[in-house]
């Protein structure tokens, strides 16, 4: 792997990876699902790294892998945009409502998030993490009861290129892991910015290949 996280590698189908993850298998599994929903209104398509603990998917990748990925992404100079956001997020589980307040601008958004489909890839002995391809609908809500159950503070750094945002997020607040000594949750995810504009099968394949690239970064930092 070269020093920079060079996304031009994804144009070369002969690229030999340190991780033997089968991207073609991933593509074949999720392409029909993405094609079914990518033109839906308010659709969100994301890929999240994590670990399965029974049926629960824990998206906390830990500080060391998180930092390793961030350092490598920051070395790459070909990003179209790098965005930093700080958010206060309030959740209500009964109807999946969340209120997000941008700490820098004060802008507030209210949505209801409903899961459409999860495709899980777990127990992969040749990859450092499990991962989940998730399709959801995030519907804007104009008027909402502001009684919420949970609150989180999120700091996010987003690396954007070719219709994909690689998001590195730290969260503080309510957590699923009550035994964790670190109050911070470290999350790595990728979101297709505008699913409607996926041009062709090759572009989708290249987007999905980023999962393998992230795993390669983690493999080379062991």
Indicate residue ranges for each PLM-predicted region:
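Phosphate-end processing signature that detects enzymes handling 5′-triphosphorylated RNA
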Residues: 5-222
